[in-house]
Amino acid sequence: MATAQSPTQLVRTLIDVSRFDKYNCLFAIFPGVWSIFLAAASRHADGVHLPSDWVLGRAGLAFAYTYLLSGAGMVWNDWIDRDIDAQVARTKNRPLASGRLATRAAIIWMLVQYAASVWLMDRMLSGQNLWTFMLPLTTGIILYPFGKRPTTRKLGIYPQYILGASSALTILPAWASVYGDSVAPPDLLAKCLPLCVFLFLWTIYFNTAYSYQDVKDDCRLSVNSSYVLAGQYVHGLLLLQAVAVVMVIPWILHENGSAWLWFSWLGVWTAALAEQLYLFDTKDPSTGGRVHRRNFALGIWNVLACFVELLLVSGSLDMF
């Protein structure tokens, strides 16, 4: 039975269940915003001028729709996992697990966020091919919590794989919003593929570290997670994942990457991931959370790096 709350308390609870009071949802905005800036830079390099206010408007729409879609996904995840969350130290006080929020209110809130996200993506795409992109994203959100079940482990599927694929899929509508009908779908996919692979691998890496915080409770409750794959060699698994992330960056940059992106992306990320691997300690699961926060900082850094790349390619830095 949900606890009776004042309107102010209910608003705070709804913010809490969507993680809008934390940085987690902001991970979802990185692929779309990076992609808007990189796609706009690519078009400028091809001689197509895009007004700066138009590009920033598209980036704002990408930010807003992914943020709200992530919030809706958080509610769905917590509703499916509410009985498990109630038995895990880190998650037992979440609104649905603790009984602070009724299921009906949570579902309504989730649908409101989802509807707003659909509308914003439609605006970003100028009404073109909305459900071509939204349906795969929605499918990923629905499947994600079920990836934590022991049954999916038998199939070799881990929740990080689903989360990584969902994250990578937000790249496609962002590039499509910038290129419109000027590029055929197969060519657009070819342009996006390196960045999609990068997002898939990076998400698996930082979420493996993040989920390791719950290793004791997860083992007790048989919760499926990618670190289960490695047993006691979790550090080695994170090393392999980090190396894979770094190795994909030259694939992204080899065609159009400037000296700035080679430094700000490949150089900074290589150093940052090395520092994270040094920081992570299998004997102290809380270090997984610290690694996660450092990856959030990397995501913010890359937003700035991609924006500077756009300014460099478009010649906008000449005014400074």
Swiss-Prot record:
It comes from Aspergillus fumigatus (strain ATCC MYA-4609 / CBS 101355 / FGSC A1100 / Af293). Its EC number is 2.5.1.-. Pyripyropene A and its derivatives have very unique characteristics of selectively inhibiting the acyl-coenzyme A:cholesterol acyltransferase 2 (ACAT2) isozyme. Therefore, pyripyropenes are expected to be developed as a new type of anti-atherosclerotic agent. Furthermore, pyripyropenes have been shown to exhibit anti-angiogenic activity against human umbilical vein endothelial cells. Finally, pyripyropene A also exhibits insecticidal properties. Polyprenyl transferase; part of the gene cluster that mediates the biosynthesis of pyripyropene A, a specific human acyl-coenzyme A:cholesterol acyltransferase 2 inhibitor. The first step of the pathway is the synthesis of nicotinyl-CoA from nicotinic acid by the nicotinic acid-CoA ligase pyr1. Nicotinyl-CoA is then a substrate of polyketide synthase pyr2 to produce 4-hydroxy-6-(3-pyridinyl)-2H-pyran-2-one (HPPO) which is further prenylated by the polyprenyl transferase pyr6 to yield farnesyl-HPPO. InterPro entries: Prenyltransferase (IPR039653), UbiA_prenyltransferase (IPR000537), UbiA_prenylTrfase_CS (IPR030470), UbiA_sf (IPR044878). PROSITE patterns: UBIA. It is an enzyme of class 2 (transferase). It is a multi-pass membrane protein. Its cofactor is Mg(2+). Pfam families: UbiA. GO terms for cellular component: plasma membrane. This is Polyprenyl transferase pyr6. Keywords: Glycoprotein, Membrane, Transferase, Transmembrane, Transmembrane helix. Glycans are attached at residues 224, 256. The keyword Glycoprotein applies. It is found in: Membrane. It catalyses: 4-hydroxy-6-(pyridin-3-yl)-2H-pyran-2-one + (2E,6E)-farnesyl diphosphate = 4-hydroxy-3-[(2E,6E)-farnesyl]-6-(pyridin-3-yl)-2H-pyran-2-one + diphosphate. GO terms for molecular function: transferase activity; transferase activity, transferring alkyl or aryl (other than methyl) groups. The chain crosses the membrane at residues 22-42, 60-80, 101-121, 127-147, 155-175, 186-206, 233-253, 260-280, 296-316. GO terms for biological process: terpenoid biosynthetic process. Belongs to the UbiA prenyltransferase family. Pathway: Secondary metabolite biosynthesis; terpenoid biosynthesis.
